[in-house]
Curated annotation (Swiss-Prot):
Pathway in which the depicted protein is active: Amino-acid biosynthesis; L-methionine biosynthesis via salvage pathway; L-methionine from S-methyl-5-thio-alpha-D-ribose 1-phosphate: step 5/6
Presence of the UniProt keyword Amino-acid biosynthesis in the record: yes
Identification of the protein by name: Acireductone dioxygenase 3
A Gene Ontology molecular function term of the record: acireductone dioxygenase [iron(II)-requiring] activity
Organism: Oryza sativa subsp. japonica (Rice)
HAMAP family from the UniProt entry: Salvage_MtnD_euk
Enzyme category, top tier: oxidoreductase
Binding annotation for Fe(2+): 101, 103, 107, 146
Length: 206
């Protein structure tokens, strides 16, 4: 299991963000605390996230991706690129993505190229920044407050996976009354074990 975690940590890293809420600060900077200790992947799993590494160069024929999609019921997908060259309203859009929100379904993103940051709230409402690079697949659970931004490379190509028709509705904070939010908080407070879930997925893929 240790080697699997190390493989994932090459493309997924996480740390607590600094407390600088200055609107003038570039959201695309790392915003690490000092000292900038990395968090173990188990912390992400405790928060309900799933992180794994797949072969991005072979995504069209990757049996591991196929198995993972079958196991989790991801029947549909599309591929999007975020970059100033392909989005005339790029700066407006990344500001919109950076607004704190939640979804009523899990958000699944597979980084095929480039890089970016997912920020998620921990159990004490602190921001955890999750860096994803090529090969990283991350599942953000329904009901968790989060946001997304590109980093200073200003480019990411992602596969979006979903089980039903795509519903990108974002509920900006506060939306604590939603059932999905209540279910997430219940699972978080009960410390529902998730590391085993990741292990089962990976063991069936190998």
């Amino acid at each position: 299991m240790g080697s699997q975690v190390n493989d994932v940590e090459e493309v997924v890293q996480a740390w607590y963000m600094d407390d600088d809420d200055n609107a003038e600060e570039d959201q695309r900077l790392p915003h690490r605390r000092q000292p900038d200790d990395l968090l173990p992947l188990a912390k992400l799993l405790d928060l309900g996230l799933v992180a794994m590494r797949l072969d991005a160069d072979n995504h069209e024929h990757d049996e591991n991706l196929k198995i993972m999609r079958e196991q989790r019921g991801y029947l549909h997908m599309d591929i999007v690129e975020l970059t100033p060259e392909k989005m005339p309203n790029y700066e407006v859009m990344i500001k919109r993505f950076f607004e704190e929100h939640l979804h009523t379904d899990e958000e699944v993103r597979y980084c095929l190229d480039g890089s970016g940051y997912f920020d998620v709230r921990d159990e004490n409402d602190k921001w955890v920044r999750v860096s994803v690079r090529k090969g990283a697949l991350i599942v953000v659970p329904a009901g968790i407050y989060h946001r997304f931004t590109l980093d200073t490379n200003n480019y990411i190509k992602t596969m979006r996976l979903f089980s039903g028709g795509p519903d990108w509705t974002a509920y900006n904070r506060p939306h604590d009354h939603l059932p999905e939010r209540k279910k997430y908080l219940e699972a978080l407070h009960n410390r529902t074990p998730r590391f085993g879930q990741l292990h089962r997925i990976r063991s069936k893929m190998e």
